[in-house]
Design a protein with these regions (language model features):
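Structured domain cores in non-transmembrane regions
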Residues: 57-158
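Hydrophobic residues positioned within well-ordered beta-strands of beta-sheet architectures
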Residues: 49, 63-65, 223
C-alpha cells in the first residue's frame, strides 16, 4: 500500500514539474519594424509613399513633379515643379566647380558625370483640419511642400473632411517623354440613405481615371511625375 502511495506521489510530482516547465513564458523586447513606423505615422495623420525611378537614370531625363486638382467643373494643373536632369555632366562645369562637386560627393577624379536622383518620396501630413500638406522629396535634386485645400464632404452640420489616399497602377513605359500619375488623393461622398460618408472602391487607380471611384469622388488631387528624355 505504501509503495502504491509513493508511486502516485511521484507521478503527481512529475506532472507538476512538466506544467512548471511549460509555464516559463516570456515577453521580450524586439526591434521596431517598418510596419510599426508606418502605423505610428498613420496614427499621427501622416502617409508616406516612395517611388523608385532609377530606370530613368540610364540616360539623362528631365524630371518634373505635377499636381492636378479636379471637381465637377473639370481638372486644373495647379503646379509643375522642375528638378532638372537625372544625370549631371561635370565636363560642362568650370574646373573649380567640378572639383567642388567631386569633393562633396566623394567622386573619383576621373568621373565625368553622376546620377543626381533615383527615387521620389511623397509625404502627406496634416496642417490643420481643412488643409493637408504635401511634401515632395527627391534626394539629390529637390524638396518642396504644397498645401492641399480640403472640402467638406457635404454631410451637413459641422464641416467634415474625409479623404483617402490610393496609388495608381504603374506599368512599364517606352523611352521618351512620359507623364506618370503616382497618387490619387480623393474626397469621400455623402450617402444620404445610409447617413455615412463613403470612399469605397479599388485599391489602385487606373491611370486613365476610368474607375467608378473617380466619378463618385466630388473632389480629388493627382500627384505625378514627368520624364522628358534629353538629347
Amino acid at each position: 500500500m505504501k509503495g502504491k502511495t509513493m508511486r502516485i506521489a511521484v507521478a503527481v510530482c512529475l506532472c507538476f514539474g512538466t506544467v512548471s516547465a511549460q509555464e516559463q513564458l516570456r515577453v521580450r523586447p524586439a526591434e521596431v519594424q517598418q510596419e510599426d513606423v508606418v502605423a505610428a505615422l498613420g496614427a499621427l495623420g501622416v502617409d508616406v509613399l516612395r517611388f523608385d525611378f532609377s530606370d530613368f537614370t540610364r540616360e539623362n531625363y528631365d524630371v518634373a513633379v505635377y499636381l492636378d486638382e479636379a471637381d465637377s467643373t473639370g481638372t486644373e494643373r495647379l503646379y509643375t515643379v522642375r528638378a532638372g536632369g537625372t544625370r549631371q555632366q561635370l565636363t560642362r562645369m568650370p574646373e573649380e566647380v567640378r572639383r567642388g562637386f567631386r569633393k562633396e560627393l566623394h567622386l573619383p577624379e576621373t568621373t565625368t558625370e553622376y546620377v543626381r536622383g533615383r527615387s521620389l518620396t511623397l509625404i502627406f501630413s496634416q496642417k490643420n483640419d481643412s488643409t493637408k500638406l504635401l511634401t515632395v522629396h527627391i534626394p539629390g535634386m529637390m524638396r518642396f511642400s504644397l498645401p492641399l485645400e480640403l472640402r467638406d464632404s457635404g454631410a451637413g452640420g459641422e464641416p467634415r473632411y474625409f479623404y483617402s489616399l490610393r496609388p495608381f497602377k504603374l506599368s512599364a513605359v517606352e523611352a521618351g517623354s512620359e507623364e506618370i500619375p503616382l497618387v490619387f488623393y480623393s474626397s469621400g461622398w455623402y450617402d444620404p440613405k445610409a447617413g455615412v460618408v463613403r470612399s469605397c472602391g479599388v485599391s489602385e487607380i487606373d491611370p486613365a481615371l476610368t474607375d467608378e471611384l473617380v466619378g463618385l469622388s466630388p473632389h480629388y488631387y493627382v500627384v505625378g511625375v514627368i520624364f522628358e528624355k534629353k538629347e
